[in-house]
């Protein structure tokens, strides 16, 4: 099987267990997909779990165990073959997530990439910081499918043995192994070797701005605005009385020391600034967080657009992700505008609260939850609701808290979610 003559890329992850490899692989894929590239992770561990079962003892990973070594190679080859097939069928960036801990294994990946005329870069995660390794071991015990339902102490002990076996055979990347990036001590140092081309360069830039530390991200829309009440889109209106109540409730919600952002980000529009005014937290007003631009239709209701400009209304209904009102923006445009926000958000090591607008939060939420960008116009972003997100190695934990003071808050949120902003 040969990959068609087009620009394709393999990103092969390298590193010992508990160094954040899967977390990094998923982040790369998520970021590239969000930017419009077709990226997919091929995790060799998933192949092992599917075909051999998840409950393999640590001795399975002993380099002196011939049966285990043979079985692991078979799974690695199966993932590699599927990855090449996916690229041949139109995929763009394949992330090969495994330890790839020896020169022999990496040479096999390089040979495969060369045979199929696909560019290859290695991304090696190196960490000798005991505190980080310990935290990753505990996180793996909690979230890895390998240890689901296993006693905590047994899981940790077994995983430590697995790490020790990998350490016996581990060979770090060398300068003669082609294009690679080394991430040392969760981003303290980045070393690159023979990196060329737009996508590899973009990946390196992204990797320079991520970290493995835990932190919370909160998303909330501004309080109900006067335009929300009138059903109008866009504009720069002030909060309604109900929106003002939410502003006060938001401040009370974040008054707990256990739930305090290090920083608040808002747009430059009045309704987000008003919403955050009671928060005694450093606040930044960022133009890139402004609501999706409705162009010449700004200030109209959807009923007015439907009656006066039926062709535009129908065109947007047909392609909500790609359509832009005259002199306005589409969701696709918005995602490009938000790219610096995403990079800055990834860089932040401390919790952040973002007070923004429906379309903007849909796009940010889609990124953080690894939802295809094309689906973001249809995500539910109700007013007066705080969404708490906690990125983890195998996903993102979410909780939602309604701060609506009205007696029928669920109904109000549902109604306003459809017309209280750019929908």
Question: Where are the regions a protein language model picked out?
Answer:
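Acidic, low-complexity terminal tails and accessory targeting/binding regions
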Residues: 1-4, 171-175, 179-180, 189-216, ...
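Extreme N-terminal, non-catalytic leader segments
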Residues: 1-10, 35-38, 47, 211-212
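Pre-Walker A (Motif I) flank of P-loop NTPase domains
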Residues: 6-11, 90-92, 349-350
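Hydrophobic anchor at the beta1->P-loop junction of P-loop NTPases
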Residues: 13, 354
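The conserved Walker
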Residues: 17
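Conserved substrate/cofactor phosphate-moiety recognition/catalytic segment
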Residues: 22-84, 90-91, 105, 129-134
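A glycine- and Lys/Arg-enriched "phosphate-lid" helix/loop adjacent to the NTP-binding pocket
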Residues: 58-70, 112-172
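Phosphate-coordination/substrate-recognition cap region in phosphate-metabolizing enzymes
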Residues: 98, 103-107, 111-112, 119-143, ...
């Amino acid at each position: 099987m040969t990959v068609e003559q087009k620009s394709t890329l393999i990103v092969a992850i390298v590193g010992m267990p508990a160094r954040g490899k899967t977390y990094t692989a998923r982040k790369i894929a998520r970021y590239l997909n969000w930017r419009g590239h077709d990226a997919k992770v091929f995790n060799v561990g998933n192949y092992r779990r599917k075909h051999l079962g998840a409950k393999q003892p640590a001795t399975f990973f002993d380099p002196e165990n011939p049966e285990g070594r043979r079985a692991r190679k078979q799974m690695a080859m199966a993932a590699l073959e599927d990855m090449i097939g996916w690229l041949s069928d139109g995929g763009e960036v394949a992330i090969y997530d495994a330890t790839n801990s020896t020169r022999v294994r990496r040479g096999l990946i390089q040979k495969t990439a060369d045979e199929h005329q696909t560019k290859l870069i290695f991304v090696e995660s190196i960490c000798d910081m005991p505190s980080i390794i310990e935290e990753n071991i505990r996180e793996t015990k909690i979230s890895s499918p390998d240890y689901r339902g296993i006693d905590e102490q047994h899981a940790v002990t077994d995983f430590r043995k697995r790490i020790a076996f990998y350490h016996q055979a581990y060979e770090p990347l060398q300068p003669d192994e082609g294009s690679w990036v080394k991430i040392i001590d969760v981003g303290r140092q980045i070393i690159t070797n023979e990196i060329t081309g737009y996508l590899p360069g973009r990946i390196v830039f992204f990797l320079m701005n991520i970290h493995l530390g835990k932190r919370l991200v909160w998303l909330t829309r501004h309080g109900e605005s006067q335009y929300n009440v009138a059903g109008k889109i866009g504009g720069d209106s002030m909060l309604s009385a109900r929106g003002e109540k939410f502003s006060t409730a938001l401040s009370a919600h974040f008054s707990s020391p256990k739930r305090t952002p290090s920083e608040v980000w808002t747009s430059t529009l009045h309704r987000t600034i008003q919403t955050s005014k009671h928060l005694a937290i450093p606040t930044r007003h960022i133009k890139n967080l402004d609501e999706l631009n409705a162009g010449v239709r700004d200030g109209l209701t959807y009923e007015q657009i439907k009656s006066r400009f039926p062709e535009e209304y129908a065109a947007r209904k047909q392609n909500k992700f790609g359509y832009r009102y005259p002199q306005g923006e589409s969701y696709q445009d918005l995602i490009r505008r938000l790219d610096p926000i995403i990079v800055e958000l990834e860089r932040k090591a401390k919790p952040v609260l973002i007070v923004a607008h429906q379309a903007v939060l849909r796009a940010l939420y889609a990124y953080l939850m690894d939802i295809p960008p094309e689906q973001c116009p249809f995500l539910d972003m109700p007013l007066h609701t705080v969404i708490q997100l906690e990125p983890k190695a195998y996903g993102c934990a979410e909780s939602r808290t309604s701060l609506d003071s009205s007696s029928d808050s669920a109904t109000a949120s549902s109604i306003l979610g459809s017309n209280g902003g750019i929908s």
